[in-house]
Amino acid sequence: MAVKVLVVDDSGFFRRRVSEILSADPTIQVVGTATNGKEAIDQALALKPDVITMDYEMPMMDGITAVRHIMQRCPTPVLMFSSLTHEGARVTLDALDAGAVDYLPKNFEDISRNPDKVKQMLCEKVHTISRSNRRLGSYARPAPVAAPVPASSPAPASSFASPAPARPAATARAAAPAASHSPAPKRKPYKLVAIGTSTGGPVALQRVLTQLPANFPAPIVLIQHMPAAFTKAFAERLDKLCRINVKEAEDGDMLRPGLALLAPGGKQMMIDGRGTVKILPGDERLNYKPCVDITFGSAAKSYGDKVLSVVLTGMGADGREGARLLKQGGSTVWAQDEASCVIYGMPMAIVKANLADAVYSLDDIGKHLVEACV
């Protein structure tokens, strides 16, 4: 069956061009259009589309408000269009927090002059998020930030709710989280925590990192597939929400406990044996900039068996080969479970390759990091 799409935008030109591009794909059907957020809610309730494309700035009701209402009344995967500016990044992150699944740059020049490029990106995104867990209501909003833990005192695992046990990788798809009785992670003197993610990652990272105490003992590196204009705004957002410090990584930054470094968009991040971050130009031969495999691979080379790596929600298989190198060196690999993923792609690649030491629900990953490292 064709993927049913509702196109929402106050620009007649953009609404028409998006509809034309999507309709040219025989596996996609545009079932309706709307010019503002209020119309979008009404059309979503009436047409029950599989995917909604949504603009932000619209009369009567903006896109973020519309997304919040839609998620409450008829949860539907939403693809936001956003500008590639710092303000556009902030708005897009707000939309993802409200429940949108993914985003695309809103570029009138591209949609006019590069229709083939836009068609490929847009149709691929629509197909991917149509298979997301958003409609099932299995991916809730971020957990509230816990009360601060004094940095001067250790944070025992008991200061958090008792974490759910791990699920064996072989049964990750079949077993429900509550049905698992596998052991919780063992403590180990990890020198680095490395987390990679893509679609659904901004909300997932927020959920994980807000559970960590200010005195978390291991340095953290974050690899999120995201454009260059977005990563600085995302790091600033996380820094305000978390008890640990978060910043966009710069060349020469030093890893240290209580600090998470986010790989800058459009570039690659590597780590050397002295704990120094190297930021390299994005290689055009690689699909992802930043690339999880690149950072994981450098961590494997520099830290041997002292890395705790986590692969969260995301499309594709980035992170699998880097995780393979980490496993070969004796390090630990965790994957997010299918039920709590927006897109079960990257974690599935880890599980199918038999690289996962444990599979955890998103709600439990932060707690388990505390248990394993603190």
From Swiss-Prot:
GO biological process: chemotaxis
Pfam families found in the cross-reference section: CheB_methylest, Response_reg
Cited NCBIfam families: PRK00742.1 (NF001965)
Spans annotated as Disordered: 144-186
EC number: 3.1.1.61, 3.5.1.44
Superkingdom, natural source: Bacteria
UniProt protein name: Protein-glutamate methylesterase/protein-glutamine glutaminase
Lineage, opening ranks: Bacteria, Pseudomonadati, Pseudomonadota, Gammaproteobacteria, Pseudomonadales
